[in-house]
Amino acid sequence: MPTIKQLIRNTRQPIKNVTKSPALRGCPQRRGTCTRVYTITPKKPNSALRKVARVRLTSGFEITAYIPGIGHNLQEHSVVLVRGGRVKDLPGVRYHIVRGTLDAVGVKDRQQGRSKYGVKKPK
């Protein structure tokens, strides 16, 4: 507990909340261009080849974004929309690519959870 003298000398600092997605600069999504599309392996105990893309955003940041869903059409110079949201077993991946917008097409033959993968309602 500080004394009154200590509080006069320097006031209490407000707690600053740190953003989990700084590259978005407070926006819900950002547009970017893929500079590299590749796969990485998750940390223990999981095992897979997770599809990720290195994306240069309009905010100037270069980030690593996860490509959700089965199969994708992304390659270098593809324009994508990026949202926040980390992938728990991929260290350093703090963003997701939004499927069904710009150059990222929706997941083929998706029946359930379609809105998360940019798929229209089947006729």
Swiss-Prot record:
Entry's Gene Ontology BP terms: translation
Keywords for the protein's UniProt record, in alphabetical order: Chloroplast, Plastid, Ribonucleoprotein, Ribosomal protein, RNA-binding, rRNA-binding
Disulfide bonds: none
UniProt-listed SUPFAM superfamilies: Nucleic acid-binding proteins
GO MF term set: rRNA binding; structural constituent of ribosome
Gene Ontology, cellular component aspect: chloroplast; small ribosomal subunit
InterPro entries, A to Z: NA-bd_OB-fold, Ribosomal_uS12, Ribosomal_uS12_bac
Keyword RNA-binding belongs to the record: yes
Claim: 4Fe-4S is one of the keywords in the record: no
Localization (cell): Plastid, Chloroplast
Broad class of where this protein is predominantly found: plastid
Domain of life: Eukaryota
Subunit note: Part of the 30S ribosomal subunit.
Summary of the function given for this chain in its UniProt record: With S4 and S5 plays an important role in translational accuracy. Located at the interface of the 30S and 50S subunits.
Similarity section: Belongs to the universal ribosomal protein uS12 family.
Name the record gives this protein: Small ribosomal subunit protein uS12cz/uS12cy
Organism name: Ranunculus macranthus (Large buttercup)
Lineage, top ranks: Eukaryota, Viridiplantae, Streptophyta, Embryophyta, Tracheophyta
